[in-house]
Amino acid sequence: MCDDDVAALVVDNGSGMVKAGFAGDDAPRAVFPSIVGRPRHQGVMVGMGQKDSYVGDEAQSKRGILTLKYPIEHGIVTNWDDMEKIWHHTFYNELRVAPEEHPVLLTEAPLNPKANREKMTQIMFETFNSPAMYVAIQAVLSLYASGRTTGIVFDSGDGVSHTVPIYEGYALPHAILRLDLAGRDLTDYLMKILTERGYSFTTTAEREIVRDIKEKLCYVALDFEQEMQTAASSSSLEKSYELPDGQVITIGNERFRAPEALFQPAFLGMESAGIHETCYNSIMKCDVDIRKDLYANSVLSGGSTMYPIAADRMQKEITALAPPTMKIKIIAPPERKYSVWIGGSILASLSTFQQMWISKQEYDESGPSIVHRKCF
């Protein structure tokens, strides 16, 4: 490769998973949990070369002896030291690149505090010496990945959900709605309702087991009341799950009660509107002339939209809210778990995007606040 043709790095820092790879690729090279684990017990084996912290998959596999922490909560970085560890791990261990040689595209949830992206910018330039960087809004990238420039994206990951209406490539900031209800809340809720069944899950390691149960067995009910009756009258909906110690647990109506909280946040004691209403409210904040285009291009993105039947339920709920003659189309791409990353890969490899990067020189002249001027 000659100097001017260095591949950009695309890093989608989710609250739950980091997706990282090279611009122009069709899928991320590295996908690992955004966790940093620290030993719960003092090491007794002298000379074992025990580390004081573990990142990602290694932390996940040693979770029995570690306390696991997620440095990103609700899409906002709450622990910058741990975040640096995750980025360091991403560049040096997963992608095996020198970050000072590649421009890097990072992603962020909309309506994040300004300080969050300033600090991201500062760390990239000062700690990792990046030659250039850019911060893109996650939902906009998902829309690019679906091959559209107009539509409304409902993006729900592990830490935060948001609806972003986009018209001809521009996000409409006044109509963006954010919902701090996502995968991690559903995991916590599933822990709670499984405890009511008599199974106890309390530690950070056990939470990871529940997350796995959620990902493997949960689904969205098309009609919640009806499903509850079915579950009460027969055992057809029951599934069993084997815990790491060989114990087998049975899970019934919890399979759809947990994801139902997306549509009925009251289950979690939250007063916000469900995801279908949030989508509708977001569309209603837009100009009356473009609503038709948004209804017909509603794109789902993120891991928490991966539940079976989620798209059908969304279609049903939004149809009930929208005007009767409106054509409503919910688009649920099969790769939507990674569509933010894929959109980033597309964006960073466009020739027209190359002048959009914030260069090291610009950063040195203006400081971290440049990110608000250059990145929308």
UniProtKB/Swiss-Prot annotation:
N-acetylcysteine modification, residue list: C2
Main localization, broad class: cytoplasm
Modified residues (N-acetylaspartate): D3
Reaction(s) catalysed (UniProt annotation): ATP + H2O = ADP + phosphate + H(+)
InterPro entries (UniProt xref): Actin (IPR004000), Actin/actin-like_CS (IPR020902), Actin_CS (IPR004001), ATPase_NBD (IPR043129)
PTM annotation: Oxidation of Met-45 and Met-48 by MICALs (MICAL1, MICAL2 or MICAL3) to form methionine sulfoxide promotes actin filament depolymerization. MICAL1 and MICAL2 produce the (R)-S-oxide form. The (R)-S-oxide form is reverted by MSRB1 and MSRB2, which promotes actin repolymerization.
Record Pfam families: Actin (PF00022)
Annotated positions of the Methionine (R)-sulfoxide modification: M45, M48
Signal peptide: none
Family membership: Belongs to the actin family.
Function of the protein: Actins are highly conserved proteins that are involved in various types of cell motility and are ubiquitously expressed in all eukaryotic cells.
Protein's UniProt name: Actin, cytoskeletal 2A
Organism expressing this protein natively: Strongylocentrotus purpuratus
Gene that this sequence comes from: CYIIA
